[in-house]
């Protein structure tokens, strides 16, 4: 075993010879004491959790860590295949409930919950352990699959989707935390790409698998969701077994003690610990965040509703209230929250601020054009379910490939900003190319595929480089909070993008269809074309009705790309702010090298 991990026997004796366990993690204790204001400190529970993670990391052998990383890859492969499959099913599930235009609203709510669930997941991982939190996330995901499969209306489907998103987010976040626990900063760019590797294959397999389920039929899309409730728990067993075994090994060696194990405490103490945990989750902050952003974004995503004086007043009141709630959130979290849900003070660091601005605008731009892209391809271009998804997935494939490449480039040159300086112009040029060449009257897919590849390459270089930028200025104790803040900005950006997409799609597509088809079809049939993708596809290509539908879909999707281009220009603001921090194994004061026997 390497010197980085230290001798197990030496650690065992050291822990036994000291009555106070926390003395073994003096750097973390010193950081806590010198943190300054109380709401900028690392909590006692989190401090103990980080100490526990480091103690467990010291027990990894070469064999056990290989098993863990293989298990991590297997879980990532199954998760990515599921995502690529169910993405195509989603628009048919909503169409089954006559709510195809609600796609953006569902993604909007999902992105808001994405931003919120990360903080509790990180806190749970710090307090209770990586293994326990991974099991919780897995359980939520499985329950989400089953709820989606058996949903009876769009409301039940949305609630089930939220549960599913929470679980999937937990799995992804905990995978990154496990990698961070067992790697140095210099190697983390490469290792962080492990969960992304499966996308190189699943982007091609998923759409074909989705087509095989026949999602246009009611039972087809339900089966496509439900089957994963059995697959995912099975493939997660190697990773979970490896984590629990090494946790047991560390505890048996006396490398840590669980001061906050609820089983060993009386009822009053359990209640006190539950209150402490709730306080650390910043429950009030979460309520303010969810209510504020939901009230702000939902009116925009439903802009197709009939405008009346009453609805206008209600919308203005809703937006005003949401802004007040968000201002209150910022003031409360900065001034009064003992352990704020979002580490807003970290934004004082220009590298973290710039990375957050960059990832916010990137995800906003992406979600603006991507929400309805495959629907547009199926209608206007006449592509099948699998071919439309495969066309979009060339973006995902190129993004994943360049993200992996960026890890090796950061390892080779020890820099991340040069990659950001290349990625942002590349992505913007890709979006511009889609507008100029990708969407054409001849419905050729080759130009669209080429410019999607260019945009995806820019996105891949950007996402991982910006994430490493945040980690490069974060200590181990602050890593989870700062990473959560960064990912929150990505989710909020996605929520804004979905809100804009939903509003533009609902308002402009519905008005175009009504204006162009009112002399050919009754209003209820026009509404059905708008709400149900299957109705739009039921009209044969080449007929007058289908041509009108195609023109309306094309014009609306092109509008979304124009807005996406404008949003992407703001990425340059974040790029300018970020410092060029050199990467090395010393950046991270508690980084741990991969062990070897």
UniProtKB/Swiss-Prot annotation:
Keyword annotations from UniProtKB, A to Z: Ion transport, Iron, Iron transport, Membrane, Phosphoprotein, Transmembrane, Transmembrane helix, Transport
Pfam families documented for this protein: MFS_1
The keyword Phosphoprotein appears for this protein: yes
Residues with the Phosphoserine modification: 46
Localization: Membrane
Membrane-spanning ranges: 65-85, 97-117, 131-151, 159-179, 190-210, 225-245, 281-301, 312-332, 357-377, 390-410, 419-439, 448-468, 485-505, 558-578
GO cellular component: fungal-type vacuole membrane; plasma membrane
One GO term of the biological process aspect: transmembrane transport
GO molecular function, one term: siderophore-iron transmembrane transporter activity
Recorded topology in the membrane: Multi-pass membrane protein
Main localization (coarse): membrane
Alphabetical list of InterPro entries matching this protein: MFS (IPR011701), MFS_dom (IPR020846), MFS_trans_sf (IPR036259)
PANTHER family: MAJOR FACILITATOR SUPERFAMILY (PTHR23501), SIDEROPHORE IRON TRANSPORTER 2 (PTHR23501:SF87)
Role of this protein: Involved in the transport of siderophore iron and so has a role in iron homeostasis.
Family: Belongs to the major facilitator superfamily.
Name listed for the protein in its UniProt record: Siderophore iron transporter 2
């Amino acid at each position: 075993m390497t010197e980085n991990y230290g001798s197990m026997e030496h650690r065992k004796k050291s822990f036994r010879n000291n009555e106070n366990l926390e003395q073994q993690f003096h750097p973390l204790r010193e950081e806590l004491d010198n943190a300054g204001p109380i709401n900028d400190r690392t909590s006692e529970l989190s401090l103990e959790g980080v100490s526990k993670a480091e103690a467990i990391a010291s027990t990894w052998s070469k064999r056990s860590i290989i098993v863990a990383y293989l298990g991590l890859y297997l879980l990532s492969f199954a998760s990515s295949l599921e995502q690529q499959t169910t993405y195509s099913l989603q628009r048919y599930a909503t169409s089954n409930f006559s709510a195809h235009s609600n796609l953006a609203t569902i993604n909007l709510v999902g992105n808001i919950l994405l931003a919120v669930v990360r903080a509790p997941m990180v806190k749970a991982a710090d307090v209770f352990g990586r293994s326990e939190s991974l099991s919780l996330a897995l359980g939520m995901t499985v329950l989400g699959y089953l709820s989606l499969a058996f949903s009876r209306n769009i409301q039940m489907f949305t609630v089930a989707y939220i549960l599913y998103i929470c679980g999937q987010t937990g799995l992804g976040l905990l995978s990154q935390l496990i990698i961070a626990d067992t790697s140095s900063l210099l190697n983390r760019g490469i290792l962080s790409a492990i969960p992304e590797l499966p996308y190189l294959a699943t982007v091609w397999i998923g759409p074909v698998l989705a087509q095989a389920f026949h999602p246009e039929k009611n039972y087809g899309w339900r089966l496509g969701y439900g089957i994963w409730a059995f697959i995912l728990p099975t493939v997660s067993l190697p990773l979970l077994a490896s984590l629990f075994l090494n946790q047991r090994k560390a505890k048996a060696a006396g490398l840590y003690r669980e001061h906050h194990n609820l089983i060993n405490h009386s009822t009053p103490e359990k209640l006190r610990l539950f209150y402490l945990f709730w306080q650390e989750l910043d429950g009030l902050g979460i309520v303010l965040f969810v209510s504020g952003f939901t009230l702000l974004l939902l009116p925009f995503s439903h802009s197709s509703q009939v405008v009346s004086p009453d609805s206008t007043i209600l919308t203005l009141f809703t937006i005003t209230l949401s802004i007040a709630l968000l201002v209150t959130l910022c003031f409360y979290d900065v001034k009064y929250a003992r352990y704020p849900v979002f580490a807003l003070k970290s934004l004082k660091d220009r590298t973290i601020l710039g990375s957050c601005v960059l990832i916010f605008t990137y995800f906003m731009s992406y979600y603006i054009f991507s929400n309805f892209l495959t629907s547009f391809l199926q209608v206007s271009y006449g592509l099948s379910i699998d071919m439309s998804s495969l066309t979009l997935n060339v973006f995902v494939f190129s993004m994943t490939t360049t993200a992996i490449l960026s890890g090796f480039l950061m390892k080779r040159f020890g820099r991340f900003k040069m990659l950001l300086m290349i990625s942002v112009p590349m992505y913007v040029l890709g979006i511009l190319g889609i507008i100029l060449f990708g969407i054409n009257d001849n419905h050729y897919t080759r130009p669209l595929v080429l410019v999607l590849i260019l945009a995806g390459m820019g996105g891949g270089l950007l996402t991982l480089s910006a994430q490493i930028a945040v980690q490069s200025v974060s200590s181990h104790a602050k890593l989870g909070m700062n990473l959560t803040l960064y990912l929150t900005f990505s989710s909020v950006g996605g929520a804004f993008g979905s809100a804009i997409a939903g509003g533009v799609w609902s308002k402009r597509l519905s008005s175009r269809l009504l204006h162009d088809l009112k002399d050919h079809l009754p209003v209820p049939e026009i509404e059905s074309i708008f709400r149900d993708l299957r109705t739009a596809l039921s009209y044969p290509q080449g007929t007058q009705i289908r041509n009108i539908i195609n023109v309306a879909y094309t014009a609306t999707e092109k509008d979304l790309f124009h807005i996406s281009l404008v949003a992407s220009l703001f990425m340059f603001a974040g790029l300018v702010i970020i410092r060029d921090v050199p990467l090395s194994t010393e950046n991270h004061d508690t980084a741990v090298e991969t062990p070897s026997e």
